[in-house]
């Protein structure tokens, strides 16, 4: 049965249609927010997947180019590989949804979101987040929802709920918050050094709006919701846990995990697993879930150590950061390099500079974003965790980590006018034991400064974890979590920022939400740790951006010309600009506003190219002197190229102070000559002279002017 539900959301109409399309999905919501239309569906398999120890949730977000009136490029004219924005949207939908499914549920679940129409003022990403929550809530899939999401901007100190496209361009914050009925379950933010208290207030402003949306979803579920289906639990039998505890005591397990060396811990657990396999040999049913059992035993042990004994697996205090180290200039011929080490996590970052034409071209749904000048790429090779796997290119995790560090650094980068370069930083994970994305922020800052990029402030990143008990008041926030505390804990709260405020947040949790006190403590902890890293580790290594670029980096000089003369510089079919490039070996970028960036490794050739361009766009007037090349000879005189496509003629009588019988007696094709403009007639023809007396007059005038 088709039903439609509507509410006002930030001054725009949100309409949810149920039963109109996709009737065979477990749940489907046809979402309309303003003129944005997204189809969100939730579907589950009828049986659990065998042989896995995780919940197999897949989230898809498909950006259809017809939604913005475009036909895809390429030979096939079809949408291809998911864009970076689509991948990041999948991750931001996944994070609030995943904790709300049962932990022992092993049926495959797919959340599909198809963007069918885009209103720039109504975010399709937000619409898909709401659509996935609604589709799952009304389906028969077990789900502890609903949840809702809201975006918040900050303009002139005022919070803007679900900002429009124009508002996003001037906002100091891009915050997305997802909530359940009582708690915050997901935070994603980019910000222009926003103070911590303002960020906290914005988070809970969004949380208030989310409660209105949840009440709206409740009305939809009340009318259209299906009864949740029963499922086969994959929980480990208590009898097996009891048997394992008799073979390996809690004290033995605690001793196995209590070490600051990741590989030693893994070796200890492998020995315990082998001991259990030998003891339980013959019981195939128990052996099939032994791996999950050992994992759960480790988890319970680590959580008890932290929450009850205030003892972390590597012996650190609750607020203590692992050993830190930083250095720059590891690679001699790259444009900039920096390495940041935190315990057994190590990132080597390399910075590369290029002309603005090398900026990444974007062909997505956002008409305001057609290119990206700063790119941060994150790589995670298998050797960083001591494993052997073939390299298959970046996955969703790598793209997400790269984007988080990129978002943290964008607010401190110089503008294209101040620093006319495209910038790429690449974070290579050398070693990993938690928080590699935050180490990437620190390493990127080091390499940018080493490369001479004049960033406004240094940026550092740190992550906090969480272990909770049975009540909201029973919890412990951990500063600088390592991998084990991430795996077995309840939260990974990543914050990047400067001494002035926050530039990026990403919060992942495994429980049903966080209270305000936990969020406030986590943000306060990350600020304290960030300031320590900036002042005691990074600044002693490099206190400010270098004043000069690497000798191996391209040099760029910028001039501005009259936009109406861009065509003169480019020439018919690009002949003029290509000739300049061929002659000087530089790269030339021209924008519609008349900005000209000339890039090359030889500064003399850059200056030569600028001289040529200046000659092309300069209005030639009588009295001006040029150094030109003879390009054509006639019996009545010679033609001299003053600038590309700008020739002047020297009459034979003006070639010398003496009488000239033949032009070739004075000049030949290819000769470099100094000439003076005597006249520019009404037809634009330029008359020149080489007479010494004429040139001397000009030189005398020039010398007088210099004085």
Tell where the protein language model's regions lie, with residue ranges.
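Extended amphipathic alpha-helical scaffolds
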Residues: 1-30, 34-45, 53, 230-369, ...
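Glycine-rich, flexible beta-strand/loop modules in the N-terminal catalytic cores of phosphate-handling
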Residues: 25-110, 115-122, 188, 330, ...
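Mobile "lid/hinge" segments at catalytic clefts and subdomain interfaces of large enzymes
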Residues: 140-257, 448-547
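Single-stranded RNA-binding regions, centering on S1/OB-family and related RNA-binding modules
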Residues: 290, 552-556, 563-707
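Long, basic N-terminal domains or extensions that often function
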Residues: 1-232
